[in-house]
Regions:
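Ser/Thr-rich low-complexity repeats and stalk/linker segments
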Residues: 1-188
Length: 188
């Protein structure tokens, strides 16, 4: 063997694209996002948040990684890629859009008004109308209706004779909640 002309086999093969154990949530109230996944053993995983490197995780010999990221308020774009010991970079994962929203949704009850008195049997079924966050889930005494893309919601409700307590809960995509309660009286 001619030692002067020895060739070294340089690793030019990029690592496999890292794989997340589960798809990140689309919306969260928390600014903290915990990620777990799999990548080439003893490599590094680079986390890009809004196209900027935000963290780096070491991959174990078993090929696993975990990382906690801090999200910005509003929309966040997340992508990750791997770097092996030779410095080869994998392709990036697809981009994940994650909305961080810590604000409770608005909840306005337009009709009926709190304290309203409804009379006559023909008026026993009332129309409840209100406004909340776009696409929020609205629960009225445990029964769900959805707000439309502009936040409007409307549903019919059957009143019992006497005082009726109506409990409203609005829940947005990030699971923030707003609660309200009104009382409506029904007389035959």
């Amino acid at each position: 063997i001619d030692k002067d002309n020895a060739t070294t086999d340089k690793d030019n093969v990029p690592p496999q694209v890292p794989v997340l154990a589960s798809t990140p949530v689309e919306a969260t109230f928390s600014a903290s996002l915990n990620l777990q996944g799999f990548a080439e053993p003893k490599s590094k995983v680079i986390f890009l948040l809004n196209s900027v490197k935000s963290a780096e995780a070491e991959v174990t010999e078993a090929g696993q990684f975990t990382q906690e990221l801090t999200l910005n308020e509003g929309l966040n774009e997340l992508a990750i890629y791997g770097v092996d010991a030779a410095g080869n970079e994998s392709l990036k994962t697809r981009s994940y859009l994650i909305s961080q929203d810590a604000e409770a949704p608005i909840l306005e009850i337009k009709t009926p008004k709190d304290g309203a008195v409804i009379e006559l049997k023909k008026n026993r079924t009332i129309k409840i109308e209100g406004q909340s966050e776009a696409n929020a889930k609205i629960f009225i005494n445990g029964r769900m209706t959805l707000a439309d893309s502009e936040g409007n919601f409307s549903t019919d409700f059957y009143l019992n004779e006497g005082k009726n307590t109506l409990e409203f809960i609005a829940i947005d995509k990030a699971t923030n909640k707003t609660q309200k309660q009104i009382e409506v009286e029904f007389k035959l």
